[in-house]
Every structure is written in C-alpha cells, then in structure tokens.
Amino acid sequence: PDFVVDTPQVVVEGPGEGHTLNPGEPGSIFDDAVDVTGVGQFYRADGFVCTGTLINPRTVLFAAHCVNDAGEDGFGAAVGNIPAAFAFQADALDGLRSWIRSGYSSVPEDYVYNIEQILFDPDSLARPEARGFLESDVALAALDTPASDVPTWAMLFSPLATPDSIDSVSGTGYDVRVVGYGRSGYGESGSFQGTDFRRRAAENVLGALASLNDRNEWLFGPGDYGLPQNLYQTDFDDPNGTNPFDFNLFRDGAR
C-alpha cells in the first residue's frame, strides 16, 4: 500500500490534551528528571543524529541505518574518517559543542564520548528499497574512553511471554517507555519538530511481536509485501476516539 509509511515516529497527544514537546511546560515529555540515564544522542560530524543505549562502559547499541550509508570503515576521527560520538545528557547540545571544540575528542565531564569503531549487520543493506530500515537494523559503537559514570542497560535475548489474554483497555499488558532523541510531534500532525538534541520519553503499550507483512495482510489482504522481519510494534491511539484513521490496530486504550 502506497500510503503506509514504514518509518518509526515518536508522537504524543497535542498541547492542552495532556502532553507537550516543550521543556518547562505542564505535561512536557522532555526526559530530564534524571540527567544521565544511559540513553544517548549519536552525532556524526557530517550532520546525522540518532539515539543509542549504553550496554557496557565501552559499547553502545544503536541502529544500523544511522551509519550503514558510510560503511564500517567510514568512521573515526583518529584515522581521518567521519568523526562520531555519543553524548548522554538530557540536553545533549552542550556535549556536541564540547566534542567539536575539543577536536572530536571525548569530554567525560560533559558525558560525551568519541567513537573509535563501529560495526553493523550487513543484512541491513540487503534490500535497497527499505533504505536501511527494518531488517537487521543493529549496530554497535566502541567508545575510545570508558563511560564509567554513565548507567548501562541489560539486554533481553528471548521473546516476551505471550499474554494469556488481550483486552481493550490494557491490551497485551506490556506497558513500555519509549525514550530517544530526534524528531517529535503530535498525533494529528506527525513528527514535524526537528532535532533539538533533547531526550524525550513517552509511554505506550506493546501491541505485538509481528512483521509488517502481518500488519498489511490484516489491513489490506494477502499480498507479497516483502516485509517479513518480526518487530515489536506499538500503535498510536486517538485519546478522544474520534480520528477516522484510528482503528486501534492492537486493541489497547490510549496512554
């Protein structure tokens, strides 16, 4: 279906409906209650940004589509390639400035760490029409300095247990918190706001472990959609229940 856009977006209710993108306002989703959480902003000196999670003091897990256009050997300021770094403050702009001023070096006091090496799954490039998204979208970054003062996150390698039942309020029962940097917006408008280097967080319900083939076949009928990768998926529900495009794909209430 030509009108389905298969790219991740982070959107919330509009202002006056409980949430806002703006820091310092009631209902803000700016994630600054704890400044350094282990979720960080990825910078590339050629202008790209992404989000990653620190899984040990030297390693960040993030998405292959952030880097697979340049190749694994395309990064590293020390060898004359594209400089790249991760910064872990809630507002990562100061970290970016410190990194640039230092000549693309780690500045631990600002929680910004230069990247020494990047590895990504080459299968993320297997289908050019996917633009590096969806399949095998996994990369690892090795920091040149241990981020010893930054919390690390554990990894789950097994599927979540299948719920015994699903209801129209709590869905699967798996409440999740979505955290990251980058574009953001509201349900009616989509992700209209560009990157401002701030970390934001919102809650949702995990809807399904399923492929986009499964979704499309349910919506549009059988077809060769070419999207077999299983993904944990969420939907965005209109809190007022009036939007004609909100058909509550995963049978859970708005959060």
Where are these regions (language model features)?
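Short glycine/acidic-enriched loop and turn motifs that connect beta-strands
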Residues: 67-70, 184-186
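Extracellular trypsin-like serine protease catalytic domains
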Residues: 200-255
